[in-house]
Protein backbone atom coordinates (compact mmCIF):
# COMPACT_ATOMS: atom_id res chain seq x y z
CA UNK A 1 0.00 0.00 0.00
CA UNK A 2 2.78 2.41 1.02
CA UNK A 3 4.73 1.50 -2.12
CA UNK A 4 1.68 2.13 -4.31
CA UNK A 5 1.07 5.50 -2.64
CA UNK A 6 4.70 6.52 -3.15
CA UNK A 7 4.54 5.59 -6.84
CA UNK A 8 1.34 7.58 -7.23
CA UNK A 9 2.96 10.65 -5.69
CA UNK A 10 6.00 10.33 -7.95
CA UNK A 11 3.71 10.01 -10.98
CA UNK A 12 1.81 13.14 -9.97
CA UNK A 13 5.05 15.05 -9.55
CA UNK A 14 6.27 13.94 -12.97
CA UNK A 15 2.97 14.99 -14.54
CA UNK A 16 3.05 18.43 -12.98
CA UNK A 17 6.75 19.18 -13.13
CA UNK A 18 8.48 18.28 -16.37
CA UNK A 19 12.24 19.00 -16.74
CA UNK A 20 11.38 21.99 -18.93
CA UNK A 21 9.01 23.39 -16.31
CA UNK A 22 11.57 22.81 -13.56
CA UNK A 23 14.20 24.67 -15.57
CA UNK A 24 11.79 27.54 -16.22
CA UNK A 25 11.04 27.80 -12.50
CA UNK A 26 14.75 27.97 -11.72
CA UNK A 27 15.32 30.63 -14.36
CA UNK A 28 12.49 32.71 -12.91
CA UNK A 29 14.56 33.10 -9.74
CA UNK A 30 17.35 34.95 -11.53
CA UNK A 31 17.58 38.23 -13.41
CA UNK A 32 19.00 37.78 -16.90
CA UNK A 33 20.08 40.95 -18.68
CA UNK A 34 18.20 41.68 -21.94
CA UNK A 35 21.39 41.33 -23.99
CA UNK A 36 22.28 37.95 -22.49
CA UNK A 37 18.69 36.71 -22.73
CA UNK A 38 18.46 37.63 -26.41
CA UNK A 39 21.80 35.99 -27.19
CA UNK A 40 20.81 32.75 -25.44
CA UNK A 41 17.44 32.69 -27.21
CA UNK A 42 19.09 33.14 -30.61
CA UNK A 43 21.93 30.67 -30.09
CA UNK A 44 24.62 33.35 -30.05
CA UNK A 45 27.92 32.94 -28.22
CA UNK A 46 27.78 33.90 -24.54
CA UNK A 47 30.70 33.93 -22.09
CA UNK A 48 30.11 33.74 -18.34
CA UNK A 49 32.43 35.82 -16.12
CA UNK A 50 32.81 35.50 -12.35
CA UNK A 51 32.71 38.48 -10.01
CA UNK A 52 35.00 37.58 -7.10
CA UNK A 53 37.93 38.90 -9.12
CA UNK A 54 36.14 42.27 -9.19
CA UNK A 55 35.29 42.47 -5.49
CA UNK A 56 38.25 40.65 -3.94
CA UNK A 57 40.88 40.43 -6.67
CA UNK A 58 41.95 44.05 -7.05
CA UNK A 59 41.28 47.51 -5.61
CA UNK A 60 38.76 50.09 -6.85
CA UNK A 61 38.75 51.66 -9.43
CA UNK A 62 41.24 49.30 -11.07
CA UNK A 63 38.77 46.45 -10.63
CA UNK A 64 36.04 48.36 -12.45
CA UNK A 65 38.34 49.33 -15.30
CA UNK A 66 39.55 45.75 -15.70
CA UNK A 67 36.01 44.35 -15.62
CA UNK A 68 34.91 46.76 -18.35
CA UNK A 69 37.97 45.95 -20.47
CA UNK A 70 37.38 42.20 -20.13
CA UNK A 71 33.74 42.60 -21.19
CA UNK A 72 34.88 44.72 -24.16
CA UNK A 73 37.31 42.01 -25.25
CA UNK A 74 34.48 39.46 -25.19
CA UNK A 75 32.27 41.71 -27.33
CA UNK A 76 35.06 42.58 -29.78
CA UNK A 77 35.53 38.87 -30.44
CA UNK A 78 31.90 38.20 -31.27
CA UNK A 79 30.44 36.98 -27.97
CA UNK A 80 28.19 38.47 -25.28
CA UNK A 81 29.67 38.83 -21.77
CA UNK A 82 27.57 37.64 -18.82
CA UNK A 83 29.19 38.78 -15.58
CA UNK A 84 27.45 36.95 -12.73
CA UNK A 85 26.81 38.28 -9.21
CA UNK A 86 24.10 38.42 -6.54
CA UNK A 87 22.76 41.92 -5.83
CA UNK A 88 20.23 42.52 -3.04
CA UNK A 89 19.55 38.80 -2.98
CA UNK A 90 18.86 38.55 -6.71
CA UNK A 91 21.22 36.42 -8.83
CA UNK A 92 22.11 38.52 -11.89
CA UNK A 93 23.28 36.95 -15.15
CA UNK A 94 24.83 39.87 -17.01
CA UNK A 95 25.33 43.22 -15.28
CA UNK A 96 24.46 46.73 -16.43
CA UNK A 97 27.13 49.44 -16.21
CA UNK A 98 25.49 50.73 -13.02
CA UNK A 99 25.45 47.25 -11.45
CA UNK A 100 29.07 46.65 -12.41
CA UNK A 101 30.08 50.00 -10.89
CA UNK A 102 28.19 49.23 -7.70
CA UNK A 103 29.79 45.81 -7.33
CA UNK A 104 33.26 47.23 -7.92
CA UNK A 105 32.83 50.12 -5.47
CA UNK A 106 31.49 47.84 -2.72
CA UNK A 107 34.67 45.78 -3.00
CA UNK A 108 35.41 43.38 -0.17
CA UNK A 109 32.23 44.29 1.71
CA UNK A 110 30.49 42.02 -0.81
CA UNK A 111 30.36 38.43 0.39
CA UNK A 112 32.66 36.04 -1.41
CA UNK A 113 30.05 33.51 -2.54
CA UNK A 114 30.86 29.88 -3.30
CA UNK A 115 28.24 27.31 -4.21
CA UNK A 116 27.46 26.53 -0.57
CA UNK A 117 26.72 30.20 0.19
CA UNK A 118 24.21 30.92 -2.59
CA UNK A 119 21.02 30.09 -0.69
CA UNK A 120 22.05 32.15 2.34
CA UNK A 121 23.00 35.24 0.30
CA UNK A 122 19.70 35.05 -1.60
CA UNK A 123 17.65 34.42 1.56
CA UNK A 124 19.21 37.37 3.42
CA UNK A 125 18.99 39.62 0.35
CA UNK A 126 22.71 40.14 0.48
CA UNK A 127 25.32 41.06 -2.11
CA UNK A 128 27.48 38.21 -3.33
CA UNK A 129 30.49 38.01 -5.63
CA UNK A 130 30.48 34.57 -7.22
CA UNK A 131 33.48 32.27 -7.12
CA UNK A 132 34.06 29.65 -9.80
CA UNK A 133 31.73 27.13 -8.14
CA UNK A 134 28.85 29.60 -7.77
CA UNK A 135 29.35 30.99 -11.27
CA UNK A 136 29.25 27.46 -12.68
CA UNK A 137 25.92 26.88 -10.93
CA UNK A 138 24.25 29.96 -12.40
CA UNK A 139 25.80 29.58 -15.85
CA UNK A 140 24.52 26.01 -16.02
CA UNK A 141 21.06 27.12 -14.87
CA UNK A 142 20.60 29.40 -17.88
CA UNK A 143 22.46 27.32 -20.47
CA UNK A 144 25.80 29.14 -20.83
CA UNK A 145 28.47 26.67 -21.99
CA UNK A 146 31.70 28.71 -21.73
CA UNK A 147 33.04 30.40 -18.60
CA UNK A 148 36.18 32.56 -18.42
CA UNK A 149 38.10 33.18 -15.19
CA UNK A 150 41.65 33.96 -14.11
CA UNK A 151 42.47 30.73 -12.33
CA UNK A 152 40.42 28.10 -10.56
CA UNK A 153 40.80 27.06 -6.95
CA UNK A 154 42.33 23.72 -6.14
CA UNK A 155 44.03 21.57 -3.54
CA UNK A 156 45.88 23.82 -1.11
CA UNK A 157 49.43 23.12 -0.08
CA UNK A 158 49.47 21.06 3.15
CA UNK A 159 45.92 19.90 2.38
CA UNK A 160 46.88 16.58 3.98
CA UNK A 161 46.62 18.46 7.29
CA UNK A 162 44.01 21.14 6.55
CA UNK A 163 41.75 19.23 4.12
CA UNK A 164 41.44 22.56 2.28
CA UNK A 165 40.23 21.63 -1.19
CA UNK A 166 38.31 24.17 -3.24
CA UNK A 167 34.69 23.46 -4.09
CA UNK A 168 35.61 24.69 -7.59
CA UNK A 169 36.90 21.18 -8.28
CA UNK A 170 33.79 19.30 -7.19
CA UNK A 171 31.59 21.84 -8.98
CA UNK A 172 33.56 21.22 -12.18
CA UNK A 173 33.06 17.50 -11.68
CA UNK A 174 29.28 17.82 -11.75
CA UNK A 175 28.71 20.77 -14.11
CA UNK A 176 29.08 20.24 -17.90
CA UNK A 177 30.58 23.64 -18.68
CA UNK A 178 33.96 24.55 -20.19
CA UNK A 179 36.11 26.70 -17.91
CA UNK A 180 38.83 28.78 -19.53
CA UNK A 181 41.58 29.69 -17.05
CA UNK A 182 45.33 30.10 -16.69
CA UNK A 183 45.42 26.79 -14.87
CA UNK A 184 45.22 26.93 -11.10
CA UNK A 185 46.64 29.64 -8.89
CA UNK A 186 50.34 29.10 -8.16
CA UNK A 187 49.67 29.34 -4.41
CA UNK A 188 48.10 25.87 -4.65
CA UNK A 189 49.41 22.31 -4.93
CA UNK A 190 49.19 21.83 -8.69
CA UNK A 191 50.06 18.08 -8.94
CA UNK A 192 47.44 17.19 -6.33
CA UNK A 193 44.90 19.47 -8.01
CA UNK A 194 45.38 17.65 -11.32
CA UNK A 195 44.95 14.31 -9.55
CA UNK A 196 41.73 15.53 -7.94
CA UNK A 197 40.38 16.77 -11.28
CA UNK A 198 41.01 13.31 -12.73
CA UNK A 199 39.07 11.79 -9.84
CA UNK A 200 36.20 14.16 -10.65
CA UNK A 201 36.32 13.05 -14.33
CA UNK A 202 37.07 16.57 -15.53
CA UNK A 203 38.69 16.69 -18.97
CA UNK A 204 41.81 18.88 -18.69
CA UNK A 205 43.78 20.21 -21.66
CA UNK A 206 46.50 22.83 -22.02
CA UNK A 207 46.12 25.29 -24.88
CA UNK A 208 48.94 25.06 -27.43
CA UNK A 209 51.19 23.49 -24.80
CA UNK A 210 52.13 20.06 -23.49
CA UNK A 211 52.63 21.40 -19.98
CA UNK A 212 50.00 22.59 -17.53
CA UNK A 213 50.41 26.32 -16.78
CA UNK A 214 50.84 27.72 -13.25
CA UNK A 215 48.83 30.93 -13.43
CA UNK A 216 51.68 33.47 -13.32
CA UNK A 217 54.05 31.24 -15.31
CA UNK A 218 53.67 29.29 -18.55
CA UNK A 219 54.91 26.05 -17.04
CA UNK A 220 54.32 24.26 -13.76
CA UNK A 221 56.53 21.23 -14.22
CA UNK A 222 53.39 19.09 -14.62
CA UNK A 223 52.55 17.45 -17.93
CA UNK A 224 49.09 18.39 -19.15
CA UNK A 225 46.69 15.42 -19.42
CA UNK A 226 45.80 16.55 -22.95
CA UNK A 227 46.46 19.31 -25.48
CA UNK A 228 44.28 21.45 -27.76
CA UNK A 229 45.62 23.74 -30.46
CA UNK A 230 42.77 26.02 -31.51
CA UNK A 231 39.39 27.43 -30.47
CA UNK A 232 37.82 24.99 -32.93
CA UNK A 233 39.50 22.04 -31.16
CA UNK A 234 38.05 23.26 -27.87
CA UNK A 235 34.59 23.76 -29.35
CA UNK A 236 34.51 20.23 -30.74
CA UNK A 237 35.36 18.80 -27.32
CA UNK A 238 32.60 20.85 -25.67
CA UNK A 239 30.12 19.84 -28.36
CA UNK A 240 30.95 16.15 -27.95
CA UNK A 241 30.71 16.44 -24.15
CA UNK A 242 27.22 17.93 -24.51
CA UNK A 243 26.00 15.38 -27.07
CA UNK A 244 27.24 12.51 -24.89
CA UNK A 245 25.31 14.04 -21.98
CA UNK A 246 28.35 13.83 -19.74
CA UNK A 247 27.75 15.69 -16.49
CA UNK A 248 31.40 16.55 -15.78
CA UNK A 249 32.99 19.79 -16.90
CA UNK A 250 36.02 20.71 -18.96
CA UNK A 251 39.09 22.77 -18.06
CA UNK A 252 41.09 24.47 -20.80
CA UNK A 253 44.30 25.85 -19.31
CA UNK A 254 45.70 28.88 -21.17
CA UNK A 255 49.36 29.81 -20.51
CA UNK A 256 49.96 33.43 -19.53
CA UNK A 257 51.35 35.55 -22.43
CA UNK A 258 55.14 35.17 -22.65
CA UNK A 259 56.01 38.82 -21.95
CA UNK A 260 54.20 38.62 -18.60
CA UNK A 261 55.61 35.22 -17.67
CA UNK A 262 59.14 36.56 -17.22
CA UNK A 263 58.38 37.74 -13.67
CA UNK A 264 57.39 34.22 -12.64
CA UNK A 265 60.43 33.58 -10.42
CA UNK A 266 59.92 36.85 -8.54
CA UNK A 267 56.26 36.04 -8.01
CA UNK A 268 56.99 32.46 -6.89
CA UNK A 269 59.46 33.74 -4.28
CA UNK A 270 56.85 36.20 -3.02
CA UNK A 271 54.27 33.40 -2.97
CA UNK A 272 56.44 31.24 -0.71
CA UNK A 273 56.89 34.14 1.72
CA UNK A 274 53.16 34.93 1.68
CA UNK A 275 52.30 31.29 2.39
CA UNK A 276 54.60 31.33 5.41
CA UNK A 277 52.98 34.53 6.68
CA UNK A 278 49.50 33.08 6.18
CA UNK A 279 50.37 30.06 8.32
CA UNK A 280 51.95 32.25 11.01
CA UNK A 281 48.87 34.50 11.10
CA UNK A 282 46.49 31.51 10.95
CA UNK A 283 44.77 32.79 7.80
CA UNK A 284 42.65 29.92 6.52
CA UNK A 285 39.49 29.05 4.57
CA UNK A 286 38.09 31.44 1.98
CA UNK A 287 40.15 34.28 3.48
CA UNK A 288 43.41 32.65 2.47
CA UNK A 289 43.41 33.20 -1.30
CA UNK A 290 42.56 36.96 -1.14
CA UNK A 291 45.21 37.38 1.58
CA UNK A 292 47.87 35.59 -0.44
CA UNK A 293 47.13 37.41 -3.69
CA UNK A 294 47.16 40.81 -1.95
CA UNK A 295 50.39 40.02 -0.10
CA UNK A 296 52.10 38.73 -3.24
CA UNK A 297 51.09 41.92 -5.03
CA UNK A 298 52.68 43.99 -2.22
CA UNK A 299 55.88 41.94 -2.23
CA UNK A 300 56.25 42.19 -6.02
CA UNK A 301 55.51 45.91 -6.19
CA UNK A 302 52.39 45.40 -8.28
CA UNK A 303 53.99 43.02 -10.78
CA UNK A 304 51.70 40.12 -9.87
CA UNK A 305 48.55 42.25 -10.26
CA UNK A 306 49.65 43.41 -13.72
CA UNK A 307 50.28 39.78 -14.67
CA UNK A 308 46.90 38.77 -13.26
CA UNK A 309 45.10 41.38 -15.35
CA UNK A 310 47.03 40.34 -18.47
CA UNK A 311 46.17 36.67 -18.13
CA UNK A 312 42.48 37.37 -17.48
CA UNK A 313 42.31 39.48 -20.65
CA UNK A 314 44.09 36.76 -22.62
CA UNK A 315 41.67 34.15 -21.27
CA UNK A 316 38.74 36.38 -22.28
CA UNK A 317 40.11 36.65 -25.81
CA UNK A 318 40.54 32.90 -26.27
CA UNK A 319 37.36 32.04 -24.36
CA UNK A 320 35.33 34.28 -26.65
CA UNK A 321 36.81 32.63 -29.72
CA UNK A 322 35.90 29.22 -28.27
CA UNK A 323 32.33 30.34 -27.54
CA UNK A 324 31.91 31.65 -31.10
CA UNK A 325 33.33 28.43 -32.58
CA UNK A 326 30.91 26.43 -30.41
CA UNK A 327 27.91 28.51 -31.50
CA UNK A 328 28.77 27.69 -35.11
CA UNK A 329 28.56 23.96 -34.36
CA UNK A 330 25.13 24.15 -32.73
Swiss-Prot record:
Major localization class: other
Family matches, as SUPFAM superfamilies = Indigoidine synthase A-like (SSF110581)
Q: What keywords are annotated for this sequence in UniProt?
A: Glycosidase, Hydrolase, Lyase, Manganese, Metal-binding, Peroxisome
Recorded GO molecular functions are:
metal ion binding; pseudouridylate synthase activity; RNA glycosylase activity
Recorded catalytic activity of this chain's protein: D-ribose 5-phosphate + uracil = psi-UMP + H2O
Residue positions annotated to bind Mn(2+) are 164
Q: What is its EC number?
A: 4.2.1.70
Subcellular location(s) per record: Peroxisome
Which cofactors are reported in the record for this sequence?
Answer: Mn(2+)
Family according to the record: Belongs to the pseudouridine-5'-phosphate glycosidase family.
What does the subunit comment say?
Answer: Homotrimer.
Q: Which HAMAP family match?
A: PsiMP_glycosidase
Protein name, entry field: Pseudouridine-5'-phosphate glycosidase
Native source organism of the sequence: Arabidopsis thaliana (Mouse-ear cress)
Amino acid sequence: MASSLAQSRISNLQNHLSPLEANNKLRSLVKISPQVSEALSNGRAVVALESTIISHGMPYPQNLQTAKEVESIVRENGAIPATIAILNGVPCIGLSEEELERLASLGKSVQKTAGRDIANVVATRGNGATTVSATLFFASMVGIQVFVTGGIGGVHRHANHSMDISSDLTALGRTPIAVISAGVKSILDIPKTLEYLETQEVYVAAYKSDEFPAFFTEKSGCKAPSRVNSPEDCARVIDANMKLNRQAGILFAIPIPKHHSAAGNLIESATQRALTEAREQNVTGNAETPFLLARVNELTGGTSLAANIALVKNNALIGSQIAVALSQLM
